[in-house]
C-alpha cells in the first residue's frame, strides 16, 4: 500500500511479492524464514493407529482405521502399529493383533484411566519420539478431535481433519483429500 509516497505492508498483504518485483529497487525486501531442518524420512517407519476406547471397549472407528492403515502400509512395505493407552487394557491389546496390527504399544497406567489431554498428549509424544511412525491415523471422535491437534502442534507437524480419501505415496508421504 502506498501512503504519502511511502510503501507499507498491511493486513491485506497476500505475500505475492509483486511489490518486490515491480516496486522501486530496494524499496521492499522479502526476507525468507530460516530453512527448516530436513528430516531423514528413512528413519520414520510404520503407520500408527490411535486406539480410541472407553473403559477398554474399543471404538469401532479404530477397526476402520486399522484396515486403512493396513492398506496404506502394504503400498510402502511398512508395519502397522496400534497405540493403546489407558488402565487395565492389556488384555484387550492382544485382540488388535487379529485385525491386522503388527505390533501394539500399550501404555497401561492408573493415571491414564480417564482421558486427560495433558497426559494423553505426553504419552503420544513419547510414542512418536521412540517409534517414529511415518503417519498416524486418529478417529474423528470426541477424544480424537481434541488429541490429534494437540499432538500435531507438539510435534510441529501437519494435521488434516475429516479426510475422505487417504493415499500413501512411494516416498511415504500421506496424501489426504477432504
Language-model segments: what does each one mean?
Residues 1-178:
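N-terminal glycine-rich FAD/FM-binding segment characteristic of electron-transfer flavoproteins
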Amino acid at each position: 500500500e502506498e501512503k504519502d509516497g511511502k510503501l507499507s505492508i498491511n493486513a491485506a498483504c497476500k505475500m505475492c511479492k509483486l511489490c518486490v518485483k515491480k516496486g522501486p529497487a530496494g524499496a521492499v525486501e522479502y526476507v525468507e524464514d530460516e530453512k527448516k531442518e530436513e528430516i531423514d524420512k528413512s528413519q520414520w517407519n510404520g503407520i500408527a493407529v490411535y486406539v480410541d476406547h472407553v473403559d477398554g471397549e474399543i471404538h469401532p472407528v479404530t477397526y476402520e482405521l486399522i484396515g486403512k492403515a493396513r492398506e496404506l502400509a502394504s503400498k510402502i512395505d511398512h508395519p502397522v502399529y496400534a497405540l493403546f493407552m489407558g488402565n487395565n487394557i492389556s488384555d484387550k491389546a492382544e485382540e488388535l493383533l487379529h485385525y491386522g496390527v503388527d505390533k501394539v504399544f500399550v501404555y497401561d497406567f492408573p493415571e491414564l484411566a480417564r482421558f486427560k489431554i495433558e497426559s494423553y498428549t505426553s504419552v503420544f509424544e513419547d510414542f512418536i519420539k521412540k517409534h517414529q511412525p511415518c503417519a498416524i491415523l486418529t478417529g474423528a471422535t470426541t477424544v480424537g478431535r481434541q488429541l490429534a491437534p494437540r499432538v500435531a502442534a507438539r510435534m510441529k507437524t501437519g494435521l488434516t481433519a475429516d479426510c475422505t480419501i487417504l493415499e500413501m505415496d512411494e516416498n511415504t508421504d500421506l496424501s489426504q483429500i477432504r
